[in-house]
Amino acid sequence: MIYTDPATGATTNTDAAGNNYLNRLTPNTFLIILAVVVIVALIIIFMQSSSNGNNSSSPAAVPQMGFPLNTTMRANPFVATPQRL
């Protein structure tokens, strides 16, 4: 924006590169920021998924009600269970 001083009539360009930090945001800088955000998000997801210490290669001992799959399957009406004759 061009500002004109009413007293002196001098004009000042307020859109100079030093006044707006977005002018320094190049695509390369944006990609670096995006990569850092993605890496941090992946680290957080990894830490959350392995917070109880169990993974697919060495599953840890789980309490009895840790995964109530049996209860869930019994309560699911959409599972076709074989009937005894």
Curated annotation (Swiss-Prot):
Cell compartment(s), UniProt: Virion membrane
InterPro entries per record: Baculo_ODV-E18 (IPR019655)
Pfam families, A to Z: ODV-E18
Annotated GO CC locations: membrane; viral envelope; virion membrane
Primary location class: virion
Highest taxon above the source species: Viruses
Keywords of this entry: Membrane, Viral envelope protein, Virion
Functional description taken from the UniProt entry: Component of the polyhedra envelope.
Protein name, UniProt field: Occlusion-derived virus envelope protein E18
